Amino acid sequence: MSVEPGKWGVIYNPKAGTRKVQKRWKEIKEYMDSKGVSYDYVQSEGFGSVERLAGILANNGYRTIVVVGGDGALNDAINGIMSSNAEKKEEIAIGIIPNGIGNDFARYWELNLEYKLSLIHISE
């Protein structure tokens, strides 16, 4: 399958965090739409699905994969990309929009937890 260049594959993990996280996902989608971000999104459904979905996105040719979730979802997505059959895996950009409970990865790397700024950084 060929994906239009520049189109993001977005994985939303609704299990990360609380009900507030689900409301925030709606805001994130609306913001991406208002900024003209070209993306397809998939929603994880349970244990192991983020890893599987990231592998599918990589195999389908997405060059930017964005995780909307927490530390566990980010880890699973990286594992999914690396275990995929995608060519040039090292050229796949992975982005994180922190949307979990702890977001330790984002805090350690001083990534802003505000999704609008995260989206700006990913776009660059």
Name each model-derived stretch.
Residues L117-E124:
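Residue-level detector of conserved catalytic or cofactor/ligand-binding positions
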Residues A58-N59, S84, L111-E114:
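Short, hinge-like loop/turn segments at secondary-structure boundaries
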Residues G70-A73, N99-I101:
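Short glycine-rich anion-binding loops that position phosphate/pyrophosphate groups of nucleotides
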Residues M1-V68, N79, K116:
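ATP/NTP phosphate-donor binding region
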Residues G80, Y108-W109:
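Residue-level signal for well-ordered alpha-helical positions
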Residues R52, D76, D104-F105:
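Phosphate- and divalent-cation-binding pockets in alpha/beta enzyme and binding domains
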Residues A86-Y108, K116:
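Short, acidic/small-residue loops that bind anionic groups at enzyme active sites
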Residues A73-A86:
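Short Gly/Thr/Asp-enriched flexible loops that form oxyanion-binding sites at enzyme active sites
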